[in-house]
Amino acid sequence: SMSGVFVSFNSSDSTEVDLYRSMPENTSYSTWGFWSLTASDAASATDSVSASVNNGFWVGGETISFSDLPTSGSASMSGAALMDVAYRHDQSGSNYGVQRYQTAADVAATFNWGSSSWSGTIAVSNFDQDNPIVSNAGFTSFSFELDPSSNTFYGADSTDILDNAWQGGASVAGQFFGDSSPEQTGGTINVNLYKSGSADTSGANDFYVAEGIYLLCISGGC
């Protein structure tokens, strides 16, 4: 069986939480919020399996078509990201020791429009600076060169090099929101940092995973 809930930020009971207020609110063409899901396999009363997600993030809006994108000029947008984090730090053997929490980051983007295509960059800063893995990997800020596909885009393997033998990177996927022109952009950001080595060596198999959303508005506000 499966059950869940899907709620916007403005209609939730979390509107006074400082972390969430870093995101744009009351936007003209988009919204974001939370989702929770519980699923269970009750095939056997003695061998049931259940899983749940609490306060995942979602973002959506009024998408525009490729023909609505400008054919010249540029645009700058800014906003924030919200992420669910899970990480394992300085552990060894069977001592899993995973910590979970939520964090935010600043996000900015520049888009350069063309007659038949466009290009862009998304930059993330002030990302989870107090996390020991993110700090050690030198990944508190990173950026993406976007790979556009019509009115949507994707960016993988951020342009930044990791420190101290950390591996991994980040990816972004998004689309434009607006009426007849791109006024906002929103989508997902994923971060995956890890090390690999002997299971008996402390820290050799540590990892950091963050998954969440971003929402940006064109200069001048939403």
Spans of features found by a protein language model:
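Mature soluble binding/inhibitory domains
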Residues: 1-222
